[in-house]
Amino acid sequence: MSSKTDEILEQLKGLTLIEAADLVKAIEEAFGVDASAPVGGGMVMMAPAAGGGADAAEEKSAFDLVLEEVPADKKIAVLKVVRSLTNLGLKEAKDLVEATPKVVKEGASKDELKQLKKNLKQLEQK
């Protein structure tokens, strides 16, 4: 890091909680961002399925479903969704959920992903 960033870091370390909260609010207003981004159920990332050098303008029809992380309080519910999606046994699904990030399904269609997204949204509400 540069000396300027080191100096800023040292100044930040000296802030009280109230000063830090005020700083966060000021940064949010100045840059138009929200520091309270939602942290919800299992984070799922859709990665394009491996399949050569397709044209970028062509719409993807198959995706790899990657499970990024699973909050401890949602593990059982995510495990059920993974089992229904992959037809794995309980032990295999548990190992997959605990070894994130992991590809859950390869070559999934958009419809499958929409259904999974719906299932995960329901998990977040429970």
Swiss-Prot record:
Its main location: plastid. Pfam families: Ribosomal_L12, Ribosomal_L12_N. Gene3D superfamilies: 3.30.1390.10, Single helix bin (1.20.5.710). One of its GO terms (biological process) is translation. InterPro entries: Ribosomal_bL12, Ribosomal_bL12_C, Ribosomal_bL12_C/ClpS-like, Ribosomal_bL12_oligo, Ribosomal_bL12_oligo_N_sf. It comes from the Eukaryota. Keywords: Cyanelle, Plastid, Ribonucleoprotein, Ribosomal protein. GO terms for cellular component: cyanelle; cytosolic large ribosomal subunit. GO terms for molecular function: mRNA binding; structural constituent of ribosome. It is found in: Plastid, Cyanelle. The keyword Ribosomal protein applies. Homodimer. Part of the ribosomal stalk of the 50S ribosomal subunit. Forms a multimeric L10(L12)X complex, where L10 forms an elongated spine to which 2 to 4 L12 dimers bind in a sequential fashion. Binds GTP-bound translation factors. Belongs to the bacterial ribosomal protein bL12 family. Forms part of the ribosomal stalk which helps the ribosome interact with GTP-bound translation factors. Is thus essential for accurate translation. NCBIfam families: L12. This is Large ribosomal subunit protein bL12c.
